[in-house]
UniProtKB/Swiss-Prot annotation:
HAMAP family named among the record's database cross-references: DnaK
KW Lyase (keyword) present: no
Gene field: dnaK1
Job of this protein: Acts as a chaperone.
UniProt GO MF annotations: ATP binding; ATP-dependent protein folding chaperone; unfolded protein binding
CDD domains: ASKHA_NBD_HSP70_DnaK-like
Descriptive protein name: Chaperone protein dnaK1
Species: Synechococcus elongatus (strain ATCC 33912 / PCC 7942 / FACHB-805) (Anacystis nidulans R2)
Length: 655
């Protein structure tokens, strides 16, 4: 059995970890970062870009860059109006009234977009470990519905991963904190404020058991909402000052989003920050275009006023979790803050104030704790971690619709999973031969105020007076928090059931088709990455050639210059149309040949005139230290021979 990785699939950033020597470690990605932006883009030529590179091009490609897809996964169209109004990409109704997105005329489900992020994380883990990865534990917000959990599993399947377990994010954070405190009896409250959700869980830790006592949260409150108050403040002020509505310009809104996110981050450590956005819009003054800019100072106190309602809203789930667990603030031993937005000083102060001045524990990294916990759970499932038992709960009650539109709970919230419950119901009218079972999730008394999960029918009931037939309903929840419901007529033995899948749930054939599609893209993605690296080398080479030519035109004859320029143009053209590995290798050879030509010209230039000051080719570090046959770390001096001055540059070789 290969390594099982732990993945924190976040709204803003994602993170992957793995167990090494019994301890969880973060996997660095190809870019050398410990987290990866959960962003997917499609370029002009249809090339798919994921992560940091997708984030870098978002301003110039706003309509085809998808972010915060976690806000839409497993949710219905009518429930997402506020979220849809904020994004710069196009949302369209999908199967079963879900939310799909359009990128470059292609319609994608949230599962597919999430799978693209998961696929990159998987590839990064394979590069890091040097072996294939096929299994994972993925975390989700504790307040994710059954449909959202199943949709996340579907995304994992599309990415080619067998999802061994879905773990609640605050529970994973507690695992990462408590792995070295297994025999310490304590109650931990985990406050997890991520990009789109807030979760609060209370756990009892002792005798190697992590038992969740209660969980509460808000699926519509996260870091994105704190960014949004700054975006609105900037857009409103600009509208008042310039009579230009930046909300109508997707590129401008994307720039506002990025600047607002950075301002929020800055204000976590600084008392004030400057938001500078030149050329954000253009106005017509006296018939001529005039560029407009934003340069404004935002103080931490201003931001806290703008976000005061959001800060206050974070306290409600804490109160609910304490109430559900029958605990007081004095009975909580540790408070863990998790999620990037938990760094906001106003949040930390509000939590500390609520707990009577008790200081939250800041020893764990808010961005990495959840992935580390997922890796520990992966180790438990893989047998590497022993004597650790995790007992999680369902966040919302599960039940069904009964006569009069009443929601009847079968399994109460905060019930430990896995679990099952059975209850007997009967018919509502005489001669009734069919019952429809409507399964819901929520806490309200009426059906209309709760989340519908699915419906199915049990037919073939023998006609009888109402109240006579006995219909046995069984609710079964697995360790992932995913529900199976079955109904059986005790009189005939006839049975029917349903596995609650994601809203707009994908069939196994659809998942398989998307998985094959993702594998096809994987090869294209690798070619695109290599092409970008090659293009960077080429641009450096061309820049060096042009600067050398500009400063030393007398060193090249027309006969020498023309073939070089032809080679440069051919390479530039070739880099625009690479489609396979063979073409890529051919371009590498052409680039290497061109590099040698330019090296030769540069060497000739130095031989002719010791005063030439332009290095002909953009040097790498290896170029500067030179080749060293004896393997020692020598210092190589590059000198300029000049009667007037001698410049010596020392470069020390470092292994």
């Amino acid at each position: 059995m290969g390594k099982v990785i732990g993945i924190d699939l976040g709204t803003t950033n994602s993170c992957v970890a793995v167990l090494e020597g019994g301890k969880p470690i973060i996997v660095t990605n190809r870019e050398g970062d410990r987290t990866t932006p959960s962003i997917v883009a499609v370029g002009r030529k249809g090339d798919r870009i994921v992560g940091r590179m997708a984030k870098r091009q978002a301003v110039t490609n706003a309509e085809n860059t998808v972010y915060s897809i976690k806000r839409f996964i497993g949710r219905r169209w009518e429930d997402t109006e506020a979220e849809r109004s904020r994004v710069t990409y196009t949302c369209v109704p999908g199967k079963d009234d879900t939310v799909n997105v359009t990128i470059r005329d292609r319609v994608c489900t949230p599962q597919e977009i999430s799978a693209m992020v998961l696929q990159k994380l998987r590839q990064d883990a394979e590069t890091f470990l040097g072996e294939p990865v096929t299994q994972a534990v993925i975390t989700v917000p504790a307040y994710f519905t059954d449909a959202q959990r199943q949709a996340t599993k579907d995304a994992g399947a599309i990415a080619g991963l067998e999802v061994l377990r879905i773990v609640n994010e605050p529970t994973a954070a507690a695992l990462s904190y408590g792995l070295d405190k297994l025999h310490e009896n304590s109650r931990i409250l985990v406050f997890d404020l991520g990009g789109s959700t807030l979760d609060v869980s209370i756990l009892q830790l002792g005798d190697s058991v992590f038992e969740v006592k209660a969980t509460a949260g808000n699926n519509h409150l996260g870091g994105d909402d704190f960014d949004a108050v700054i975006v609105d403040w900037l857009a409103d002020n600009f509208l008042k000052a310039e009579s230009i509505d930046l909300r109508q310009d997707k590129m401008a809104i994307q720039r506002l989003r990025e600047a607002s996110e950075q301002a929020k981050i800055d204000l976590s450590t600084l008392p004030t920050t400057t938001i500078n956005l030149p050329f954000i819009a253009t106005a017509t003054v006296d018939g001529a275009p005039e560029p407009k800019h934003i340069e404004v100072e935002l103080q931490r106190e201003q931001f806290e006023v703008l976000a005061s309602n959001l800060v206050q809203a974070t306290i409600e789930p804490i109160q609910q979790a304490l109430k559900d667990s029958n605990l007081t603030i004095d009975q909580i031993d540790r408070i863990l803050l998790v999620g990037g937005s938990s760094r906001i000083p106003a949040i930390q102060q509000a939590v500390q104030k609520f707990f009577g001045g008790k200081t939250p524990d800041l020893t764990i990294n808010p961005d990495e704790a959840i992935a580390l916990g997922a890796a520990i759970q992966a180790g438990v499932l893989g047998g590497e971690v022993k004597d650790v038992l995790l007992l999680d709960v369902i966040p919302l009650s599960l039940g069904l619709e009964t006569l009069g539109g009443v929601f009847t709970k079968i399994i109460e919230r905060n019930t430990t999973i896995p679990t099952s419950r059975t209850q007997v119901f009967t018919t509502a009218t005489d001669g009734q031969v069919m019952v429809e079972v409507h399964v819901l999730q929520g806490e309200r008394a009426l059906v209309k105020d709760n989340k519908s999960l699915g419906r199915f029918q049990l037919t073939g009931i023998p006609p009888a007076p109402r109240g006579v037939p006995q219909i046995e309903l069984a609710f079964d929840i697995d360790a992932d928090g995913i529900l199976n419901v079955s109904a059986r007529d005790r009189g005939t033995g006839r049975a029917q059931g349903i596995r609650i899948t994601s809203t707009g749930g994908l069939t196994s054939d659809e998942i398989e088709a998307m998985r094959r599609d993702a594998e096809l893209y994987q090869e294209a993605d690798q070619i695109n990455l290599q092409m970008i690296e090659l293009r960077t080398q080429f641009e450096n080479l061309r820049y060096s050639f042009e600067s050398t030519l500009q400063n030393n035109r007398e060193l090249l004859t027309a006969e020498q210059q023309e073939p070089l320029e032809a080679s440069l143009n051919a390479l530039a053209s070739g880099l625009e149309s690479v489609s396979n590995e063979a073409e890529l290798n051919q371009l590498r050879q052409q680039l290497e040949a061109l590099k040698q030509q330019l090296y030769a010209i540069g060497a000739a230039a130095y031989r002719q005139d010791g005063s030439v000051t332009t290095i002909p080719v953009q040097p790498t570090f290896a170029d500067l230290i030179g080749d060293n046959d004896n393997g020692s770390n020598e210092t190589v001096a590059i000198e300029r021979n000049d009667d007037d001055a001698t410049v010596t540059a020392d470069y020390e070789a470092i292994e």
